[in-house]
């Protein structure tokens, strides 16, 4: 699991790894253009510092909305008190599908 952490962080951010070792979030991130990738990195830094003001919760899944471009979303869950587990990424056009995928991944993670 890759970990992104700044000094004095409130949360430790980790990526969910599938059985084959791949990271759904990482694969999505690598396909972003440079501007979108920077926006996502800034959002992750804010999340790490405890700023979850742009988050809506759906069935235990957090959706961090980036108000820019296509409406980028980061889907995650809190695992324990201080770990944020990145499950997926997407945009407004795939929002419903992305939420269902994130919920399924979170369920599989919790009960495996």
Language-model segment annotations:
Residues 1-71, 80-84, 91-112:
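Basic, Lys/Arg-enriched alpha-helical interface segments
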């Amino acid at each position: 699991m890759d970990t992104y952490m700044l000094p004095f962080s409130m949360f430790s951010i980790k990526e969910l790894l599938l059985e084959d070792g791949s990271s759904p979030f990482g694969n999505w991130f690598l396909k972003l253009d440079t501007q979108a990738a920077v926006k996502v990195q800034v959002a992750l830094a804010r999340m790490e510092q405890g700023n979850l003001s742009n988050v809506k919760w759906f069935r235990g899944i957090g959706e961090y909305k980036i108000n820019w471009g296509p409406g980028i979303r980061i889907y995650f869950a809190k695992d324990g008190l201080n770990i944020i587990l990145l499950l997926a990424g997407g945009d407004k056009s795939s929002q419903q599908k992305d939420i269902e995928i994130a919920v399924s991944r979170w369920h599989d993670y919790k009960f495996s």
